[in-house]
Amino acid sequence: MNERSLRVLEYNKIIHMLEDKCTSSLGREKLKELKPISNFEQITTWQKETSEAQSILIHRGNIPLGGIHDVSQYLRRTEIGSYLDPGQLLQLKETLAAARRMKTFLKDDKKESTYPIIQELGNNISSLKHIEDKIELCIISETELSDNASPELRNIRRQISSKNDAIRNKLNSIITSASNQKYLQDPIITMRQDRYVVPVKQEHRGNIPGLIHDQSSSGATIFVEPMAVVELNNQLKELRLKEQVEIERILMEIAAMIAERSDDIKSNQIILKELDFIFAKGKLSVEMRAVEPVLNTNKKISIKNGRHPLLPSNKVVPNTMWLGEDFHTLVITGPNTGGKTVTLKTLGLLTLMAQSGLHVPADYGTKLAIFDQVFADIGDEQSIEQSLSTFSSHMTNIVNIMDNVTEQSLVLFDELGAGTDPTEGAALAMAILNSLREMGTVTVATTHYSELKQYALSTEGVENASVEFDVNTLSPTYKLLIGVPGKSNAFEISRKLGLSDFLIQRSKELLTREDIQFEDLLQNIEKNRSTAEKEKDEAARLRMETQKLREEYYEKKQQLQTQKEKLISDAKREAYKIVKQAKLDADEIVENLKTLRAELEEKEMNKKIEEARKNLSDQMGKLAENMGEKLVLKTNKKPPKNLKIGESVNILSLNQIGYVILPEDANGEVQLQVGIMKVNMHVSNLERIKEEKDTKKTGVGKIVKSKAENIKMEIDVRGQNLEEAMLNVDKYLDDAYIAGLTHVTIIHGVGTGVLSAGLKQMLKKHKHTKSFREGEYGEGGMGVTIVHLK
């Protein structure tokens, strides 16, 4: 596409607007490749993907495309056997997570068949959750690995911590010793060259034996490693070296996992770049209230209420324009600042946007043609260095256009033939337009020349147009009128501004008779058009009022019908309620009668049951007396003692369970309840039943146990904003408190420090917080906060 045309039509500003819509550097990199093309099939595909993105944004809102990083260099490092530092691994994890979220987001779409292009991209994303989880397990922050990265690392760090404590204890005994106080500059322990030292006064350097590692800038203090801790420091150094070796081993292990799936990660990155770019186009379409144009290759243009995309939406005047059917050349005339150039630029820029796969700010049904080139000669771009006049500058560009134009091109001229003698300029303009017309090229030109108005009126395939001007307010309306030649309005504007009628009349006398007749004709045409336009608007208004009255009538009629149906429905419902209540009352009376009858029958039945129970009890008592010897044949060598009322016992001779209702009497017998019977048994025939304690936990204890089993000792809020993190931490602290945890860890990372500071402010006031501190070495350092709960 012609670079000069892209520049004068301000295509680069559209690219800048798209850049703001991208969420990653990958999408912005893709934008650099975007240029208008003339391949119909490719443009159609681009337009369809923009429409899919627009539809998803409208129906589902924001897209989970955050957290994408360019990890190409990281992948190359793993492929050659190198490892990545923790910060780089975190970026790679975020990119993998973004790809997985996007895949899930697109997979969850209920209308996925409506978005075949974007859905196919989503289906091709590889989910690499195992790599995400490995990095999550091992990396605490941009600079530190977790103790959980490996058992060996945890063990080494435990030894380092123990060794640190031993060194500090030894040094504390030295600096707190009364005999050493006078030799020390300060009673503190510090570090020099990764070794623990104490500050000793220069003049007492020999009083504390040890290795000198550094001195102060003034020379008054030397930093000595006492001999008592040299060996401990050496052991600590060895442990730190072992720690570093283990860290590198873990990082190499992760790098090997990444290298193994390097191709999948590269493919994901390409897809994420494409999706970011596509959704940037969709966001721009939504913002501009743009539509997908109907494309064609037969040079037909029909823009419905097109708006210049770079003008404020509350100020731009929509315009309708068409050409390519009955005419291929459009000549636009009218006063300066009337909007002719904006109209020209709107057509050119909308064409470039459409051929770049972008939607255009216009109404549905807008049709645009695909051109092999868009040529534009707009504005005064004369070269001072080349000493070119306005006319020469324009003519140089026009010569270039005429040398390269084809019948499939779009040509835009602003003030064609201006900058030279009007007669010669008009003649040149007509010759250029005629040459392009004969070639079949779609051409739009703006001009002041009356000769070009007459040329358009008298030449087949050429049409006049103008921008409307309100003489009463001396301001343009910016409305394009196709088929109506423009009028300069010089005399009317001059009169309104105060020029005397005498001078205006003298000016008219200097015009030729043909010029006067032509201007009068244009004035009559404009007057008739304006009248017709007003009558058309009035007719449309009356038609709308009639339609509104008709709709109100039908609405009233519908309301009355609805009210009528509601009254009938309410009456039926009320009648049904009365009948239903009457039935319920009747049923209640019947039930009461049945209950009364049942109560009478139950009393009679209970009386008979009681008589039967009494007879059975009497017979069992007699049986027990007559067969007492047989009942006690089976005895307990250790009869139970001190049986209490309510205790359960096993009756050995009957193999039945009974409950004590009367304690042991002088004869050693107790009275038992066995089922419905009461029997007397000797204690030697009884065996005490040991009751099992109910150890089942219920109620609050069970809930707390469940909480304690489910609540982790740490919460990770990295990547969350402060408000989201505070909500999650607050809920987590509640759960941890209920679960009975004594302390927990909040992982927030280092970053800018905003998240850490905000959470610490919250912890100061939290009801469950007893105390909190930053993590120590091996716990996560500044990237974590340890909270002790009340």
From Swiss-Prot:
Give the source's domain of life in one word. Answer: Bacteria
User: E.C. number, please?
Assistant: 3.1.-.-, 3.6.4.-
- Pfam families for the chain: MSSS, MutS_V, Smr
Please give one Gene Ontology molecular function term for this protein. endonuclease activity
Q: Which InterPro entries match?
A: DNA_mismatch_repair_MutS_C, DNA_mismatch_repair_MutS_core, DNA_mismatch_repair_MutS_sf, MSSS, MutS, MutS2, P-loop_NTPase, Smr_dom
Smr domain residues are 715-790
Which residues participate in ATP binding?
334-341
Q: Which terms are listed as keywords in the entry?
A: ATP-binding, DNA-binding, Endonuclease, Hydrolase, Nuclease, Nucleotide-binding, RNA-binding, rRNA-binding
PROSITE patterns linked to this entry: DNA_MISMATCH_REPAIR_2 (PS00486), SMR (PS50828)
Biological process (GO) annotations held by this record are: mismatch repair; negative regulation of DNA recombination; rescue of stalled ribosome
Gene3D superfamilies from the entry? 3.30.1370.110, P-loop containing nucleotide triphosphate hydrolases (3.40.50.300)
Which cysteine-cysteine pairs are annotated as disulfide bonds in the entry?
A: none
- State what this protein does: Endonuclease that is involved in the suppression of homologous recombination and thus may have a key role in the control of bacterial genetic diversity.
HAMAP family for this protein: MutS2 (MF_00092)
Q: How does it assemble?
A: Homodimer. Binds to stalled ribosomes, contacting rRNA.
Family designation: Belongs to the DNA mismatch repair MutS family. MutS2 subfamily.
User: What is the protein name for this chain?
Assistant: Endonuclease MutS2
Q: What lineage is on file? A: Bacteria, Bacillati, Bacillota, Clostridia, Peptostreptococcales
